[in-house]
């Protein structure tokens, strides 16, 4: 125990020591802050040393520590928020995720609090660390001073370099000034001066003579034949050799015996494809061109035939350079994409052999750069570049191929090995593609001749001309031989639009040919398929194999077909047929997607052993090949899937259509085949025959008959097939549904439908007796057809034709009719046939009413029968015409339940209509009160007219389809009893409307008057939002005012009602929140003159009120309630500063303080009244008349609705002022309510709030500080281009009436309303506009003492202020933006400075004038 006590004492001592240390630290921090503030005031800016060299004490940095309590608070708050997040998110996660999240949260929280514990233990050393940090900061600051001093010294050194005087050229300046010239110019400058230029006539004559000499020398000399015609001009001879070189020559003398001199030599050794690029690509010899020119010049001087010598040398140089360039391009060629399929071999005769289209798996044994190895030039595809015996570069190709248009296709002029290779590949590819083209056209000719053999037998003498000539007269293939023939096409191969087209690869590579020749060849064979699709067959330029390019995605079988075509090109016809088949299936697939249907190539289908063998056999035949697609057809309320299978015959490309009925296996995605139907008919065969397949390849893609394009025709065909399938599926689904619901039905024939239509037309013209006879006849037919119902119910599954009958007839039994509605038997019976048909995505149900109900319009004068409904209204789903009903429902909806709901609606509306008509016949008063009655099948409309036209109400009764309940609608005003009226009708088993109808009539005028209170056209003494309407029963309404007072209204008749205080109702125990209305009985009996009714409680709380006086009476009651509420609010505000003089009274109250006696009361149960008198009768400031004017001013303000509570609060705050100060404010109020001041209206704002809660009042008084806080408002009602109308600005000020001073009131600053000694919160910065206002207030406040002295105390400081502030208000109104306000302030400052300067100047001038006058007078 002793040890425990010692430990406790030690802990207490440690805690005391820690507290003392903390107090010392706080004191040190405060001292440091004070020192910092003093040093900041004395220290120069930016931490620089003072200019006078005096050293100041360094700035001690502020304490950058964070409070430990703040750290603990933040850590606990973060942990708590994380825990809240876990509670919200973990219930949605699984068990493993919840456990993981909880463990992560616990680990993280534990780690944070461990760190916090370490931080708490370490916090004991914070003072030492803070001192160390301060020392480091001081040392860093001193170090920065030293560095800045050193930098300034270095900069000074650099700036003094140029601070020296220049050396002046004195001798030159003396010469120029004395003699006017410079005599020291050197004599050698004459050598640099050029001689005078020749004249143009001399130059022209010299050039003409030189041209004549050169022409004569060429005439007598031998010229090589390779030269182009030589041109002579400007003393030069221009020599040009195609694709080799050009040279400019002249002579070195003035006679024909002079030697030739080469002026320039340009070799054309570059690629022509670079002409439009950077220009000619020079060879490696360009660097030694000067050396070459010297050698050639020496050779032609010593030669007897200098021009031949020039040509031989330069020609050999060009040929060698060209071969060297081609050889150098071999390495670049190996870096291209063709590097694995080409080999280049250099021969001993300087030839270059390029082998291309080599297989990638070819074994190159012994092949090097200079040996062929196992490559054989006579077997493998290659071309060879060599120099012939005439010293010309030639190109040969194996196998031998020639261009169909250009014999000299291979030219070395391009000087590009890659271009030559591409030309060879292009020509070889054209030859291979042309072979396929010939095979297809030969097969087409054979098919045409065999198909037209019967027609040509009669014309044996006439021989048919061939469609295509493989070779022309020159033995070259004809490029124009791919035109389509006009002969009839074979059914098995009818899409023969074949053409050769250019490949973008080769045309882009060689787009810049010389001389603009276009020698490109078509290397793509395009075969048109169905629709807009096509098949392109080309040759792979890398390996020389055929490649298939598709316009659709057929990757799964394209590779296999390419292999077949490369093995045997004769397979081209079968390959094209495969693509034709797939393209036709693609057309149907795109058409199904266009129609919004899903398309499948495979479906998980399992054959059902219970089905017949024919269905299984037909399904196996359909799915044996891949020439089919499955289109999914889904209908609403159908769980079993339906598929439309479109299959194409490979021999004739004719589509066939089958409809599959499937069933889903339980808990599986596999389906079983229920049945299968082949859709075929004469109409379908006709559509297939009209298919425009023969003209798909035309440019406009239309047939000769003017039909649409092929794809749109396929879409139309598929749409009709899907429509027929939907009709079949709908027929079967309706049959199964009716069978499931045990509803008798039968499917009528086409003749029965026509007979029924004729009978319906006859029924519309006959009377009711004929209608009954026709119904009996129809019933006999129904009974006969029902006997065959079970036999014919499933015939649709086995019928191979498309069903044309799209209707079913069914009949309800008695139990089903009673289940829908007990009133439905008045419309249909168990013998009434109901026909359902489907078309265009809608179900249409029609029947003839058993006993037609008369729908009428009952007006004031006559009644009009209505024979038809819904024909002109697209929003309604029914049509009624003389007893015949037609209902229309979408297939996606639950049509049967919707139909039953509509039948129930018709029966209920008929029942209510009958009750309403019976009430009007029984009670004569209803005929007067209910007018313009319209009875419709789905609703009832009438006008309730009780009093004047202002209370006319349109009432609509209808049945809501979702809840099957009767609803009411009132226009133009809603009835407060709507909920109880609907409840009363729907709770009645027979939908009795007696009580509801009586309540509607009795509450008609009252509901209109109540709506006028809630949404008035003009504002009154109370706000509409302060009134709450609560229905209590079918004949009682409660009106609440601010949840304090309540008025109960009980309906008695359409002429009288009873109103009472809700506080004294029978359920008063539940209304503990309500307050009794004081002296309501006196108000009702004296002000309204109503007599009280008997009440079980013995209080006079209920009065009988005529409805004609309802609106006026209720409005007076709420005005009285508003006055009571205002009086209660004023009493609460008076309690802190005033003492009550008499006991509390709800209608009046009197208070007093040291200066005044204030009484609040309600005058004549209407208006709120204020009365103020001096407590000291001897005090005449302010006088009773002035106090009366003060009360009258505030009465007017209180009557305004806006900020009424703040107005009362401001009035009470004014009454706390001393009498003399209040007298000043009264004088100001009287003064500002007079005329306008320069177009401005001034008032003390009583209805302005602030953001801060303590400063929300616009006027309040703090007696301890002798200060009044209020706002001066300046309003401008003028209309100009600069000032908008009704603009105002507020100037918040603080008036110290003891010091007679005024300063600006910052309403955003919470410290402005408290003493400066207790202000601890930081001050909030003002906006630019408020800063300008503050400066204006300070400027005007400085003028008040002088103005007070000048007025000798007759004017108050407030009156002086608002008058003096007017010049400052004008620029604020005209320039309301912050930037312009600053400019105005600067301008005013400049104007003041200018005025001061002018005054000083005037004073100086006056002094000088006075001195001058005194001096002149003394002289005189």
UniProtKB/Swiss-Prot annotation:
Positions of the region Disordered?
A: 1-59, 449-490, 750-799, 1389-1420
Q: Where is the composition biased (Low complexity)?
A: 1-43, 449-474, 755-795, 1389-1406
The record's InterPro entries line, in alphabetical order, gives: Med14_N, Mediator_Med14
- Main location group: nucleus
Task: State where composition is biased (Polar residues).
Answer: 475-490, 1407-1420
Gene Ontology molecular function terms on file: transcription coregulator activity
- Provide the coiled-coil residue spans: 1-43, 1382-1412
User: Keywords of this protein's UniProt record, alphabetized?
Assistant: Activator, Coiled coil, Nucleus, Transcription, Transcription regulation
Which superkingdom heads the taxonomic lineage of this protein's source? Answer: Eukaryota
Question: Do the record's keywords include Transmembrane?
Answer: no
**Where does the record say this protein resides?**
Nucleus
Task: Return the Pfam families for the record.
Answer: Med14 (PF08638)
Task: List GO terms (cellular component aspect).
Answer: core mediator complex; mediator complex
User: Quick one: a GO biological-process term for this protein?
Assistant: regulation of transcription by RNA polymerase II
Q: Which family does it belong to?
A: Belongs to the Mediator complex subunit 14 family.
Q: What does the subunit section of this Swiss-Prot or TrEMBL entry state?
A: Component of the Mediator complex.
Protein function? Component of the Mediator complex, a coactivator involved in the regulated transcription of nearly all RNA polymerase II-dependent genes. Mediator functions as a bridge to convey information from gene-specific regulatory proteins to the basal RNA polymerase II transcription machinery. Mediator is recruited to promoters by direct interactions with regulatory proteins and serves as a scaffold for the assembly of a functional preinitiation complex with RNA polymerase II and the general transcription factors.
Protein name as it appears in the record:
Putative mediator of RNA polymerase II transcription subunit 14
User: What is the originating organism of this protein?
Assistant: Dictyostelium discoideum
The upper taxonomy is: Eukaryota, Amoebozoa, Evosea, Eumycetozoa, Dictyostelia
């Amino acid at each position: 125990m002793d040890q425990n006590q010692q430990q406790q004492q030690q802990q207490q001592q440690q805690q005391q020591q820690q507290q003392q240390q903390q107090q010392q630290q706080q004191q040190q921090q405060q001292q440091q802050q004070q020192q910092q503030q003093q040093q900041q005031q004395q220290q120069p800016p930016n931490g620089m040393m003072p200019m006078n060299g005096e050293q100041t004490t360094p700035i001690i940095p502020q304490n950058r520590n964070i409070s430990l309590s703040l750290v603990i608070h933040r850590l606990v708050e973060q942990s708590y928020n994380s825990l809240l997040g876990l509670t919200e998110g973990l219930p949605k996660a699984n068990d493993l995720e919840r456990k993981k999240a909880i463990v992560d949260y616990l680990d993280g929280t534990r780690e944070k609090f461990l760190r916090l514990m370490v931080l708490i233990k370490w916090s004991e050393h914070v003072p030492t660390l803070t001192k160390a940090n301060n020392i480091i900061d001081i040392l860093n600051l001193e170090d920065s001073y030293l560095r800045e001093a050193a930098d300034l010294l270095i900069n000074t050194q650099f700036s003094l370099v140029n601070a020296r005087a220049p050396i002046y050229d004195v001798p030159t300046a003396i010469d120029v000034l004395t003699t006017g010239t410079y005599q020291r110019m050197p004599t050698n400058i004459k050598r640099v001066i050029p001689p005078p230029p020749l004249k143009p006539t001399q130059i022209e004559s010299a050039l003409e003579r030189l041209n004549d000499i050169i022409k004569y020398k060429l005439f007598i000399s031998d010229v090589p034949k390779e030269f182009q015609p030589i041109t002579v001009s400007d003393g030069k001879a221009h020599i040009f050799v195609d694709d080799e070189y050009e040279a400019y020559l002249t002579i070195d003398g003035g006679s024909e015996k002079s030697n030739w001199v080469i002026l320039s030599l340009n070799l054309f050794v570059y690629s022509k494809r670079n002409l439009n690029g950077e220009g000619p690509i020079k060879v490696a010899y360009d660097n030694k061109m000067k050396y070459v020119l010297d050698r050639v010049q020496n050779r032609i001087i010593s030669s007897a035939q200098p021009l031949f010598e020039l040509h031989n040398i330069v020609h050999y140089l060009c040929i060698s350079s060209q071969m060297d360039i081609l050889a150098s391009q071999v390495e670049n060629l190996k870096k291209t994409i063709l590097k694995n399929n080409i080999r280049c071999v250099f021969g001993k005769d300087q030839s270059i052999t390029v082998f291309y289209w080599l297989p990638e798996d070819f074994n190159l044994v012994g092949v090097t750069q200079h040996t062929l190895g196992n490559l054989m030039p006579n077997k493998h595809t290659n071309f060879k570049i060599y120099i012939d015996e005439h010293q010309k570069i030639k190109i040969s190709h194996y196998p031998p191929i020639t261009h169909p248009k250009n014999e000299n296709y291979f030219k070395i002029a391009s000087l590009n090995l890659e271009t030559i290779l591409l030309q060879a590949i292009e020509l070889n590819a054209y030859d291979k593609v042309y072979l396929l083209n010939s095979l297809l056209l030969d097969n087409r000719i054979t098919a045409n001749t065999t198909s037209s053999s019967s027609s040509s037998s009669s014309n044996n003498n006439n021989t048919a001309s061939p469609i295509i000539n493989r070779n022309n007269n020159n033995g070259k293939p004809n490029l124009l031989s791919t035109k389509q023939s006009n002969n009839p096409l074979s059914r098995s191969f009818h899409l023969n639009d074949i053409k050769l087209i250019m490949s973008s690869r080769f045309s882009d590579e060689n787009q810049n040919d010389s001389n603009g020749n276009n020698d490109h060849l078509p290397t793509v064979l395009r075969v048109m398929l169905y629709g807009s699709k096509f098949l392109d067959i080309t040759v792979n330029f890398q390996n020389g194999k055929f490649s298939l390019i598709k316009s659709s995605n057929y990757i799964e079988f394209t590779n296999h077909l390419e292999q077949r075509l490369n093995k045997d090109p004769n397979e081209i016809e079968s390959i094209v047929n495969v693509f034709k088949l797939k393209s036709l299936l693609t057309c149907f697939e795109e058409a199904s997607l266009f129609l919004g249907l899903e398309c499948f190539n495979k479906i998980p289908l399992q054959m059902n052993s219970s089905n017949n063998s024919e269905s299984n056999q037909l399904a196996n035949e359909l799915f044996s090949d891949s020439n089919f697609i499955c289109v999914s057809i889904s209908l609403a309320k159908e769980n079993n899937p339906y598929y439309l299978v479109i299959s194409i015959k490979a021999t004739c490309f004719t589509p066939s259509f089958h409809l599959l009925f499937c069933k889903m296996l339980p808990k599986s995605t596999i389906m079983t085949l229920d049945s299968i139907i082949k859709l075929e008919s004469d109409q379908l065969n006709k559509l297939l025959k009209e298919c425009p397949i023969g003209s798909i390849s035309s440019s406009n893609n239309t047939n000769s008959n003017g039909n649409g394009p092929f794809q749109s025709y396929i879409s139309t065909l598929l749409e009709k097939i899907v429509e027929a399938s939907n009709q079949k599926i709908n027929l079967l689904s309706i049959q199964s549904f009716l069978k499931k619901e045990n509803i008798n039905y039968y499917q009528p024939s086409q003749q029965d439908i026509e007979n029924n239509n004729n009978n319906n037309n006859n029924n519309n013209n006959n009377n009711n007796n004929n209608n009954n006879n026709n119904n009996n006849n129809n019933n006999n037919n129904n009974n006969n057809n029902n006997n065959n119902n079970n036999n014919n119910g499933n015939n649709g599954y086995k019928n191979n034709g498309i069903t044309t009958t799209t209707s079913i007839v069914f009949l309800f039994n008695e139990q089903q009719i009673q289940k829908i509605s007990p009133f439905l038997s008045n419309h249909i019976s168990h013998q009434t046939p109901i026909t359902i048909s489907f078309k265009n995505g809608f179900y249409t149900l029609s029947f003839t009413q058993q006993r037609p109900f008369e729908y009428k319009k009952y007006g004031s004068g006559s009644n009009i029968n209505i024979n038809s409904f819904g024909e002109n209204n697209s929003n309604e789903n029914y049509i009624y015409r003389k007893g015949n009903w037609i209902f229309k429902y979408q297939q996606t909806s639950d049509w049967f339940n919707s139909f039953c709901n509509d039948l129930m609606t018709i029966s209920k509306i008929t029942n209510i209509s009958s009750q309403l008509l019976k009430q009007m016949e029984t009670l004569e008063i209803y005929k007067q009160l209910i007018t313009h009655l319209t009875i419709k099948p789905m609703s009832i409309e009438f006008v309730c007219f009780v009093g004047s036209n202002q209370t006319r109400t349109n009432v609509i009764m209808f049945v809501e389809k979702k809840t099957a309940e009767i609803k009411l609608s009132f226009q133009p005003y809603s009835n407060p009893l709507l909920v109880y009226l609907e409840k009363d009708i729907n709770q009645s088993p027979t939908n009795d409307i007696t009580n509801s109808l009586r309540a509607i009539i009795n509450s008609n005028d009252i509901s209109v008057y109540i709506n006028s209170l809630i949404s008035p056209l003009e504002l009154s003494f109370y706000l509409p939002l302060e009134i709450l309407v609560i229905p209590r029963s079918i004949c009682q309404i409660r009106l609440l005012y601010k949840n304090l007072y309540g008025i109960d209204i009980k309906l008695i008749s359409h002429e009288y009602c009873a109103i009472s205080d809700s506080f004294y109702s029978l359920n008063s125990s539940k209304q503990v929140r309500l307050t009794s209305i004081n002296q309501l009985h006196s108000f009702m009996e004296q002000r309204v003159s109503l007599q009280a009714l008997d009440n079980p409680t013995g209080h006079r709380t209920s009065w009988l009120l005529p409805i004609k006086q309802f609106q006026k009476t209720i409005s007076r009651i709420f005005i009285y309630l508003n006055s009571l509420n205002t009086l209660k609010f004023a009493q609460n505000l008076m309690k802190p500063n005033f003492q009550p003089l008499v006991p509390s009274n709800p209608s009046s109250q009197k208070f007093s303080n040291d200066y005044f006696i204030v009484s609040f009361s309600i005058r004549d149960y209407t208006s709120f009244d204020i009365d103020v008198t001096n407590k000291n009768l001897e005090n005449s400031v302010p006088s009773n008349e002035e106090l009366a004017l003060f009360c009258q001013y505030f009465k007017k303000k209180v009557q305004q609705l806006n900020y009424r509570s703040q107005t009362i609060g401001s009035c009470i705050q004014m009454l706390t002022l001393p009498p003399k100060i209040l007298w000043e404010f009264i004088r100001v109020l009287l003064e500002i309510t007079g005329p306008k001041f320069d177009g401005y209206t001034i008032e003390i704002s009583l209805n302005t709030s602030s953001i801060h809660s303590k400063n929300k009042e616009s006027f309040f008084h703090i007696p301890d500080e002798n200060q009044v806080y209020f706002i001066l408002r300046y309003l401008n009602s003028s209309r100009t281009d600069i000032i908008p109308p009704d603009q105002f600005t507020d100037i918040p000020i603080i008036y110290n009436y003891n010091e007679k001073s005024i300063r600006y009131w910052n309403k955003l600053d919470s410290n402005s309303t408290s003493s400066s000694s207790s202000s601890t919160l930081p001050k909030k910065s003002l906006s630019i506009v408020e800063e300008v206002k503050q400066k204006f207030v300070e400027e005007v406040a400085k003028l008040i003492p002088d103005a007070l002295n000048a007025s000798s105390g007759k004017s108050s400081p407030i009156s002086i202020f608002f008058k003096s502030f007017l010049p400052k208000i004008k620029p604020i109104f005209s320039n309301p933006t912050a930037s312009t306000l600053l400019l105005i302030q600067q301008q005013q400052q400049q104007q003041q400075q200018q005025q001061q300067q002018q005054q000083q100047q005037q004073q100086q001038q006056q002094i000088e004038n006075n001195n001058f006058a005194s001096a002149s007078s003394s002289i005189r």
